[in-house]
Amino acid sequence: IIFRYMQSDMYNLYPSIGAVNAERGNKNFEILPSSIPNTFGSCAMKISGNKAEPPQASRGVIARTYKYMAYAYPDYFRMSPRQARLMDAWDKSYPVQKWECERAKKIQALQGNENPFVSTHCKR
């Protein structure tokens, strides 16, 4: 039943291109060598072996989502120390954007909880 909560948690739901999402699957996020081309043409997503590198514009959002999921579901969503360090780095390197704050307010009103990894930056 917890998986259903995780699966339907609005902080974990984003529109995505089905083929990209399916190919990424549960691969770990990494920074891949620049010699690896984009996997989906003009979409700046790279996938190589069991690793995936998202576009720069998505990294902060991904980081805050992963950090939230680990915080909200600690017994079910775990990151390796390496993934946690990468998510911390992306969170710092790619600041919260205005649209994230607006989205978080709407989700909090509907879902009844906040994503502290977004909301703390919105209150500043």
Question: Predicted segments — roles?
Answer:
Residues 1-124:
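Domain-level detector of nuclease and nuclease-like folds
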